Amino acid sequence: MDSAAAAAAKRVQIEKAHNFMRQYRDPESRELKKLSANQFMDVWAHYDKDGNGYIEGTELDGFLREFVSSANATDISPEAVTDTMLEELKSCFMEAYDDNQDGKIDIRELAQLLPMEENFLLLFRFDNPLESSVEFMKIWREYDTDNSGYIEADELKNFLRDLLKEAKKINDVSEDKLIEYTDTMLQVFDANKDGRLQLSEMAKLLPVKENFLCRQVFKGATKLTKEDIEKVFSLYDRDNSGTIENEELKGFLKDLLELVKKDDYDAQDLAAFEETIMRGVGTDKHGKISRKELTMILLTLAKISPDDEE
């Protein structure tokens, strides 16, 4: 390496240590450069220091200080952003990007903030959440081709390929780039780092518009009406057969399981939960429930207070 290249490399190293975001800005215009999937993950990993899936607290303060100070042409340090400026900035920033208003930034919210390769951005499905968990379970069954109860790397790659094909972008994506996207999505969503996606991890990659069962009416706050129960039944009985079965039942149980297990459950948990629920309603019909049985389940759920769920 010649002396000029060595000096340039050292300068980048110093910039990284001083302000991680500065390397991603154009030195002339100070605009953010378009990030590759790998660069985006570098930014995420740098600021999500505890690896809990959120940029929050002091991590968020550090990100905002560096994000703002890196836009300045003069080499000011992040510390130049005063606490008062930081609070004002945080308030505006969170109003614009904290979609779920939880006071922290998750990976989807960061993806909306930073300029990224268009194809990679498409994979986050910002404008296209699934209608229901029934749809989710149909997709799960389609891509879990070996019925292992997990979406492995090759199955995830097939899913991402089809997602881009659906968006008519597949011709733009090479096999190498698809592998990069698959690896990146695993880094993002594979919380337990076992190299594959379990149900709860895939549910974060493929969000559902709303888990209807999370509404307060099902948590004992108000009396359940016949209309409430009918609404739930029609939500899951997608084929209007008069019973909730197959992926409809799996989707219903997934939504129920999310109330109990929160963010960490897999296909084995779902199967065990199904067995418990079916035994609880005393049904001998394997893999399907009627309106009456759904009513029993929802009435039981409504009796459980939020404190009991913890």
From Swiss-Prot:
Ligand binding (Ca(2+) 2): 98, 100, 102, 104, 109
Binding site for Ca(2+) 1: 48, 50, 52, 54, 59
GO cellular component term, pick one: dendrite
Keywords: Calcium, Metal-binding, Repeat
Keyword set includes Magnesium: no
Protein residues bound to Ca(2+) 5: 237, 239, 241, 243, 248
Ranges where the EF-hand domain occurs: 35-70, 84-120, 131-166, 177-212, 224-259, 283-304
Top-rank taxon, per record: Eukaryota
Coiled-coil stretches: none
CDD domains to which the protein is assigned, alphabetical: EFh_HEF_CBN
Binding-site residues for Ca(2+) 3, renumbered to this chain: 144, 146, 148, 150, 155
Expressed in which tissues: Expressed in a large number of neuron of the brain and the thoracic ganglion as well as in two small muscles of the thorax.
Pfam family, any one: EF-hand_1
Amino acids binding Ca(2+) 4: 190, 192, 194, 196, 201
Similarity annotation: Belongs to the calbindin family.
Full protein name: Calbindin-32
Protein's organism: Drosophila melanogaster
Gene coding for it: Cbp53E
